[in-house]
Structure formats: C-alpha cells, structure tokens
Swiss-Prot record:
One of its GO terms (biological process) is neuropeptide signaling pathway. Hormone secreted by pancreatic cells that acts as a regulator of pancreatic and gastrointestinal functions probably by signaling through the G protein-coupled receptor NPY4R2. GO terms for molecular function: neuropeptide hormone activity; neuropeptide Y receptor binding. This is Pancreatic polypeptide. It holds the Pfam family Hormone_3. Belongs to the NPY family. The keyword Secreted applies. It is found in: Secreted. The modification Tyrosine amide is found at residue 36. InterPro entries: Pancreatic_hormone-like, Pancreatic_hormone-like_CS.
Length: 36
C-alpha cells in the first residue's frame, strides 16, 4: 500500500503544492483502482 503524501503546509511554495497534489492524485488512484 502506498504511503499517503504529507501535506507540505499552508506556506508551502507553489511547486511543493503542485508536487503534493500530483502525489495525492496518484495515491488516490492506487487506492481506488479495482483489484483484478
């Protein structure tokens, strides 16, 4: 199971937020992907 990405904080840089958003999206995709 992939680890949940850590929220970088309210004063994170846009780059950090973008990276977090991408990691979070991938994490959710891993969780919701059907197991065949």
């Amino acid at each position: 199971v992939p680890l949940e990405p850590v929220y970088p904080g309210d004063n994170a840089t846009p780059e950090q937020m973008a990276h977090y958003a991408a990691e979070l999206r991938r994490y959710i995709n891993m969780l919701t992907r059907p197991r065949y």
